[in-house]
């Protein structure tokens, strides 16, 4: 649900088949480095103005995110081709993921540590749950200036490592600044403690990607949480 733009329409005998996309497609516009350094809100404002997408946040809300008040610079030797690439790196630096909300605005969301609702076995038709829990206790990030892979870990380091690869927004500044930013990212993703799942449920229009759920009944472990990564909605069906 939300605001979508029709890209293709195919007429059939009794129906009209539509293929539509949300405003995230606008960020596939070629990247133009109009500003080489700035604060996250500055970059988001330029990006949204250039790509004609409204930002869902105030400056105060962006600054409240981890690393939201850090001065970032764009490393000249980068692989950024579109504004969508740039958004990927910026959201990563802000310990968030980006999506277009139901109002058609760009929204950044952090990983949550508490569920928004519980789905019991009478509200789902099918479900399968992984036998392992996805959680992170370390990150790996490449420093282009030194051409070294830097490893940051919690104690104990007994889970997965998230590979941030080369983020062109995290290359400038003092070593202490880079270390602080990466430590903030590590602390933010350490709240991830989700069981991968797949479930066919009674439709709940309030749910969105990124929402965290708990399941009860059947084979579900009610002590574990699961995060929605994608939603498929069938109109007039399950």
Where are these regions (language model features)?
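Residue-level signal for secondary-structure boundary sites
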Residues: 26-28, 207, 236
């Amino acid at each position: 649900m939300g605001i979508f733009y029709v890209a293709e329409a195919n007429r059939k005998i009794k129906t009209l088949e539509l293929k539509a996309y949300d405003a995230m497609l606008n960020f596939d516009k070629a990247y133009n480095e109009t500003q080489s350094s700035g604060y996250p809100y500055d970059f988001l404002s330029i990006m949204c103005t250039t790509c004609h997408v409204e930002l869902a946040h105030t400056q105060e809300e962006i600054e409240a995110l981890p690393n939201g008040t850090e001065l970032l610079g764009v490393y000249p030797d980068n692989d950024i081709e579109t504004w969508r690439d740039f958004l990927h790196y910026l959201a990563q630096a802000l310990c968030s993921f980006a999506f277009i909300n139901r109002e058609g605005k760009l929204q950044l969301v952090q990983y949550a540590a508490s569920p928004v609702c519980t789905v019991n076995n009478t509200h789902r038709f099918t479900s399968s749950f992984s036998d392992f829990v996805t959680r992170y206790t370390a990150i790996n990030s490449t420093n282009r200036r030194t051409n070294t892979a830097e490893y940051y870990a919690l104690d104990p380091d007994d889970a997965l490592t998230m590979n941030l690869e080369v983020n062109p927004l995290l290359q400038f500044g003092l070593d202490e600044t880079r270390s602080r930013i990466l430590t903030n990212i590590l602390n933010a993703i350490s709240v991830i403690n989700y069981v991968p799942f797949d479930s066919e449920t009674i439709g709940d229009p309030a749910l969105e990607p990124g929402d965290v759920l708990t399941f009860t009944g059947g084979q579900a472990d009610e002590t574990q949480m699961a995060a929605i990564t994608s939603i498929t909605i069938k109109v007039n069906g399950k």
